[in-house]
Amino acid sequence: MAFLQGKKILITGLLSNRSIAYGIAQACKREGAELAFTYVGERFKDRITDFAKEFDSNLIFDCDVTSDEQINALFADLGKSWDHLDGLVHSIGFAPREAIAGDFLDGLSREGFKVAHDISAYSF
């Protein structure tokens, strides 16, 4: 029996086959997990749909993690397909463009730091 056989895992932050989330999704699937995926905005929907198919999943959810309402809606929608969640992969990293431009710390503002921390660390 595989290590994660029958476990239900939500993967966030998958954007390409070079994403850490992609490697984690591969390992989870190889070990028997069922996977669901999130994306943010219509711009990424088709890409994540294709990745989900690669992992034999049709569970994809639009979720802006800066919105508590969207996070709550995500779990409500996921609950329509799964009766529980065994794991969540938080692989989301973001900072405003101006916060990462130029030399180290040149573009970093208090607000930019708050946004980066909220999305990259606090969101779930």
Region annotations inferred by a language model:
Residues 62-63, 83-101, 120:
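Rossmann-fold scaffold of SDR-type NAD(P)-dependent oxidoreductases
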Residues 57, 81-85, 113:
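Local beta-strand N-terminus motif with an aromatic residue
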Residues 52-69:
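Rossmann-fold cofactor-recognition segment
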